[in-house]
Amino acid sequence: MKLLEQIEKWAIETPDQTAFVWRDAKITYKQLKEDSDALAHWISSEYPDDRSPIMVYGHMQPEMIINFLGCVKAGHAYIPVDLSIPADRVQRIAENSGAKLLLSAAAVTVTDLPVRIVSEDNLKDIFFTHKGNTPNPEHAVKGDENFYIIYTSGSTGNPKGVQITYNCLVSFTQWAVEDFNLQTGQVFLNQAPFSFDLSVMDIYPSLVTGGTLWAIDKDMIARPKDLFASLEQSDIQVWTSTPSFAEMCLMEASFSESMLPNMKTFLFCGEVLPNEVARKLIERFPKATIMNTYGPTEATVAVTGIHVTEEVLDQYKSLPVGYCKSDCRLLIMKEDGTIAPDGEKGEIVIVGPSVSVGYLGSPELTEKAFTMIDGERAYKTGDAGYVENGLLFYNGRLDFQIKLHGYRMELEEIEHHLRACSYVEGAVIVPIKKGEKYDYLLAVVVPGEHSFEKEFKLTSAIKKELNERLPNYMIPRKFMYQSSIPMTPNGKVDRKKLLSEVTA
């Protein structure tokens, strides 16, 4: 598959087909090509001998997609940066990435960034003044050059830039289109922010098949009336989200085939798909196919998939996450470094062309997590699991990294920033489960000196500081105050004891 050519052919074959819809804003495939060509031409003229990554800032605006393609046509990887990301984190991404340019689809509220900022109005001028110019196709990202870089949570308190190459993305997109039986011209739900790699599961499968991306933003999700009004208008056929989002939608009785009569495929990734959620979806959407998938950001969205049928639901209380895509393989490694036999638990290691080339500017972290096996890139996921007859079963994290509502995060990163807050002497983050998956974060805090008469005022002050350093989804929902943190005999935090205390 030639990814960019495959997207561009729709500008010729179906130029007036809508490529992307967000609220009242939409773009056609013709506009997508013209504007991304104009932007790529401008980037190449301004930065002729430069291939540094470009930050793309915004939320669900159509210009985000234009900017992504404009960057890669000019030979630059893009770094999606959502509006919700705190200023301090945006600053660290800018510094770590070496980006020189930020393209903005929304007002940039972050100050003192070490990059040139192209505003919304500047972008419109570029689209207009460079219209009709086409970039040199030889300049476009290709092969093992980075296509995008997504920053994920890092245990040192600094985010890690996962580098995904053109070849990685082609491998994923081709597999997704074929294995999920995606058809030409379908409407895809775009629910995940672009800084979250789940969004890649809908963006590129939609664009290469001439589909329409129907974007749901965070304000809609916070207002169910607006959300379901949008869904009713959408005629979505391919649903891509975390299981949590679908579970929330199922709380609305009208969320069914009557609301979305042409629903064909549910694609789930990012967290555990509960058996009962899949069962309800089959009841509400009897004609739709439900696919459960698995994969970390470092292996390009997902590398396994399984069609969840009623037979699968009856056979497995905890659902398997699927069979590996044909160009990759899974190894289950025991602690001694040997390969575990069928049915035995160990660390999931992914081998093949889906695997990232590593973390940008972080050779030590890259060496720790990535290796070569039989001449192919391999990623040590830190996930526990086992394989039985080719089917992968996921058993949670081996370390303190978790997925909460689809967002992957390092508990140590949150603890790092929490301990840096005023009024905090010590802190541990405890993820609280509801059934099979994590429901919320609890912060166990040893407070320092403070003058607050009520605990809720202390909590408000700590949360205010955290909001300046971490995304909202990493802020603990509840706080518990103790005089000390329990320790193990070897001097480490006794997390098991702490969990038993807080859940007793």
UniProtKB/Swiss-Prot annotation:
InterPro entries: AA_adenyl_dom, AMP-bd_C, AMP-bd_C_sf, AMP-binding_CS, AMP-dep_synth/lig_dom, ANL_N_sf, DltA, DltA-like. Its EC number is 6.2.1.54. One of its GO terms (molecular function) is ATP binding. ATP binds at residues 152-153, 292-297, 383, 394-397, 492. Pathway: Cell wall biogenesis; lipoteichoic acid biosynthesis. Keywords: ATP-binding, Cytoplasm, Ligase, Nucleotide-binding. It is found in: Cytoplasm. The keyword Ribosomal protein does not apply. PROSITE patterns: AMP_BINDING. One of its GO terms (cellular component) is cytoplasm. HAMAP family: DltA. Belongs to the ATP-dependent AMP-binding enzyme family. DltA subfamily. Catalyzes the first step in the D-alanylation of lipoteichoic acid (LTA), the activation of D-alanine and its transfer onto the D-alanyl carrier protein (Dcp) DltC. In an ATP-dependent two-step reaction, forms a high energy D-alanyl-AMP intermediate, followed by transfer of the D-alanyl residue as a thiol ester to the phosphopantheinyl prosthetic group of the Dcp. D-alanylation of LTA plays an important role in modulating the properties of the cell wall in Gram-positive bacteria, influencing the net charge of the cell wall. NCBIfam families: AA-adenyl-dom, D-ala-DACP-lig, PRK04813.1. This is D-alanine--D-alanyl carrier protein ligase.
